[in-house]
Regions:
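Short beta-alpha connecting loops at secondary-structure transitions
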Residues: 47, 285-289, 332-341, 390-393, ...
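Mid-domain, small-residue-enriched loop/turn segments at the edges of structured enzyme/sensor domains
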Residues: 331-336, 369-407, 423
Length: 535
């Protein structure tokens, strides 16, 4: 009984008594004990902190059963029914830094091994809690907004609901125990459904009614033509999220994944890190572990190499069709295209980057030389072997991680210096003894990897991207002149990027679809990743 999970990270009734009520188990009142007694059946569904209504109904039922079975008197039962419960204040767990915590655990374990869990280590990190929460919310909001525009795939499951209202609540709680809430994305059991209205029960015990625009994402599931596996009917387990006006919207768990990371370009200190949509569902950290094609977000590094070779922002390059036969490519013939399929002829370098013109990028790389551009990219922290010296490098056909991209864009942000990302600043043991103390290094000339003039011109070029180019939504939102960045979409439209910076922060948002479908239309200005990047 002292090993059973009872919610709120409590294992066993002794721990639950302390966590929920802040007292030893022997000091619990009948009402408090009844509340804990209801937890084993469904710790999440009957958690009084998260689901007070459902938990209270369960508690009241248990008190009544205790009286009926002679464990307490009528007077004790009446008093227990009336007693208001006061819970111990819960620690704030709203930062949502699960990926940060796991990354820290891995870093510490690599240094201290098995002692990581036995020495009571206290680890201080560079992450800012407010930045972390904003990043978490923004990424999830962007992915959920995208998912609402996709074809509805159907309910997560179906459950047979009893006709007797007395048994209904327990059946709902049992069903939702296998489909826990995902933060703001709530699991719900449908009680009644029609094309105009859906009534469903949440894990908290609350009943919600969804109508109008809240049904649009699941319209196909409410159609008479819906198949048995996609139809929303009584007993269907669906997902609901609150809209900006507080109204409920039916949706589904995203199939797309994403990541966000921001660092201080002056020091390399990581300020926020979100490795995916849901750590509980997928612990793979896409910020540090996902090697993906950067697409057009890699073009600035090709342009930077061109500046070193004598190009300027006013250099004219022809945006005209290109064709490479098998002899030139060493494999298959290649006829690259611009995203919009249009060619605009001779244009300035700054216009070409703002419009993300593929033909110009390829011609620039031809002039610079693929070997030189590959070596130049390593100055920003990229791995040469992941960026083969071919012309496809101009379109971002290599492999990067979001953390690499944030670090690389920091070079432009800080005037040409390379900083190494850092997460841990201080470690002490359970006796308070200092084991590690790392202060962010001051940027100096020993860290310079590109000329300050190169970084300055690149910042001006990337400012044109956010002012009037593929990332113009950034300027339209903030009306600030100190925001610079570049969008990126891979040729197969499976990955979408936005990398941007201002003098004190560099950030990267990446979104991708692992399913065999295009993530977005082949438009480098797509609105999918920009909302998360703007926030």
């Amino acid at each position: 009984m002292n090993q059973i999970f009872l919610g709120q990270r409590a294992y066993g009734f002794a721990a639950a008594a302390e966590i929920y009520f802040g007292k030893p188990i022997k000091e619990l009142t009948i009402a408090e004990a009844a509340m804990l007694a209801g937890l084993p059946q469904a710790p999440s569904a009957y958690n009084p902190i998260a689901n007070p209504q459902r938990a209270t109904r369960r508690q009241q039922y248990i008190i009544q059963r205790m009286y009926e079975n002679g464990f307490i008197t009528e007077e004790q039962a009446e008093a227990a029914h009336r007693q208001p419960l006061r819970y111990r204040p819960q620690s704030d767990s709203g930062t949502h830094a699960e990926y940060v915590a796991e990354t820290v655990r891995q870093l510490v374990h690599s240094q201290y091994g098995d002692e990581t869990t036995t020495r009571g280590l206290d680890v201080h990190v560079t992450v800012d809690s407010s930045d972390q929460l904003v990043a978490y919310r923004a990424l999830r909001r962007g992915l959920l907004n995208y998912e609402r525009r996709q074809v509805y795939r159907g309910p997560e499951d179906y459950v047979d609901l009893p006709a007797d209202p007395a048994d209904l609540d327990a059946r709902i709680a049992e069903a939702l125990a296998d489909h826990p809430d995902n933060d703001e994305l709530k699991a719900a059991v449908v009680l009644e459904a029609s094309p105009r209205k859906v009534v469903a029960a949440l894990q908290s015990g609350e009943s919600i009614t969804v109508t109008g625009d809240g049904l649009k994402p699941v319209t196909s599931g409410l159609s008479e033509k819906a198949g048995p596996k996609t139809q929303i009917r009584r007993g269907a387990i669906v997902r609901a999220v609150k809209g900006p006006k507080g109204d409920w919207i039916l949706t589904q768990q995203p199939e797309v994944e994403g990541a966000f990371v921001s660092i201080d370009p002056r020091t390399g200190a990581i300020r926020a890190l979100v490795g995916g949509f849901d750590f509980g569902k997928n612990k793979f950290n896409h910020v540090t572990q996902a090697w993906r094609q950067p697409g057009s977000s890699f073009k600035p590094f090709i342009y930077s190499s061109a500046l070193e070779k004598g190009f300027t922002a006013q250099t004219t390059v022809n945006d005209a069709p290109l064709f490479f036969d098998a002899g030139a490519t060493g494999s298959q013939p290649w006829e690259p295209k611009n995203y919009d399929g249009k060619f605009e002829g001779p244009m300035l370098l700054k216009q070409a980057l703002a419009k993300s013109k593929n033909m110009v990028s390829i011609r620039v790389l031809q002039a610079v030389g693929t070997q030189y551009a590959q070596e130049w990219a390593t100055r920003f922290g990229f791995d040469a072997d992941k960026h083969p010296p071919y012309l496809t490098m101009a379109l971002g056909a290599g492999s990067v991680t979001p953390l690499q991209m944030a670090s690389a864009y920091s070079v432009f942000a800080n005037g040409g210096h390379r900083v190494n990302p850092m997460l841990i600043t201080r470690i002490t043991d359970n006796q308070g003894r200092l084991l590690r103390d790392v202060q962010p290094p001051e940027v100096d000339e020993s860290m310079r990897v590109i000329d300050a003039r190169n970084a300055f011109v690149m910042t001006q070029l990337l400012g044109e991207v956010t002012r009037a180019g593929t990332a113009a939504a950034v300027h339209q939102t903030f009306r600030r002149a100190d925001l610079y960045g570049k969008t990126g979409t891979t040729n197969d439209s499976m990955d979408a990027w936005f990398a941007g910076y201002q003098p004190h922060l560099a950030a990267v948002v990446w979104i991708a679809d692992y399913t065999p479908r295009k993530l977005i239309d082949p438009d480098p200005g797509s609105g999918l990743r920009l909302p998360a990047g703007r926030e």
